[in-house]
Amino acid sequence: MKQFIVIDQLRLNEKGALVCKKPSGRLCSKVHFKQGDLDGVCGAYSLAMVFNILGVFEDSSRNSDEHGNRAAEWKMIRSLNNQDLYPNGLKPCDMIKMVTQTYSKYVTIDHTGRKAGIPLKVKECIDKNAPVIMQISCNQDETQWIVAVGYAIDEGNEMSYLLTLDSRKDLRIGHFWNGILNLDRCTRLKYGFH
């Protein structure tokens, strides 16, 4: 029997929408950010999803200035705005710099470029309820940032898929993920962050 394992913070509300449980116990109304929800591209959306899941900022603070410029989300938005709309995407070095300068108390960065070690490292993070930002190569000229939130175990008790949130696609009601990364077919995973 195939099993699907997802991080503990994820929940479906009474309407079937994906929400996350904050450390304070408050459920957030939104986990998945789709391109167009923020000013940026997939890397920025992946960061926003991870920070939201980890409770770095609350969903309701996005459009509120009650906390002034100290709100964690506004720090991210200011940092993203320094780079405009990322016409060439958010580079790993820019993401690392943004995270280490502003969010180092919330997020650990672990950079790896070896395909062989990535699935096991991601599984370790998921088992600790830590979502993982990953950059994958879609083809020779295109990469995409995604957030791994779970994995699938096949009948042989082997990890076969990573379950992801992808900002390119809508998240359907009743779903915990909107992307599946087939580990047998991955050819060029490049980076992993958690």
Regions found by a protein language model. Give the residues of each.
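Active-site-adjacent structural segments surrounding the nucleophilic cysteine of cysteine proteases
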Residues: 1-85
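Short, well-structured alpha-helical interface segments that form or flank functional binding sites
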Residues: 37, 41, 45, 90, ...
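Generic short alpha-helical segment signal, independent of protein family or function
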Residues: 55, 100, 104, 193-194
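Papain-like cysteine protease catalytic cores
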Residues: 67-130
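Active-site-adjacent substructure of cysteine-protease-like catalytic cores
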Residues: 110-165
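Noncatalytic regulatory segments and standalone regulatory/sensor domains
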Residues: 151-194
